[in-house]
Amino acid sequence: VNLSDMAAMGARPRWALLAGALPDGDDAWLAAFSRGLYALAGEHGVELVGGDTTRGPRNLCLTIAGEVPAGAAILRSGARAGDDLWVSGTLGDAMLGLAAIEGRTSLDAAARAACAARLERPTPRVALGLALRGVASAMLDVSDGLTGDVGHLLERSSVGAVVDLAAVPRSGALDRKLA
């Protein structure tokens, strides 16, 4: 989510601080987490520059800092009347994956795996955010849901919007569930 927030501002992520508490005997979990963290950090050029660790119930806090040229940050408050509203990727897969994991819905094995992956390993669109710097008037990460997050953008920008829900890109798994 931190990387997606950076992407939504057109910022280049650079540094990370990780603070955490881990219980004794959590070595396998820590090894898997570390592999994932370093793979994602390496993919986006982020260096882990500090933090703190202690023993206790598992609790992690990751902070990412980055760079954007002065005056070039893309803010939620920049939308203007007449702007188009775009999304990247399909929406709803993480929510559907969580519902399947919690037993609130059923999915076939392939759809369950794909949607769970979108929940557990979201794809930050850092390159897209950088490419849209100077082009987009406003951006935000919609990981909290399209309706709520677009509402934040509209409120901050003092504009309204008409959203054609039929045009929102969805995965086949979500389309089948909605049918």
Language model region names:
Residues V1-A179:
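Helix-biased detector of long, well-ordered alpha-helical tracts
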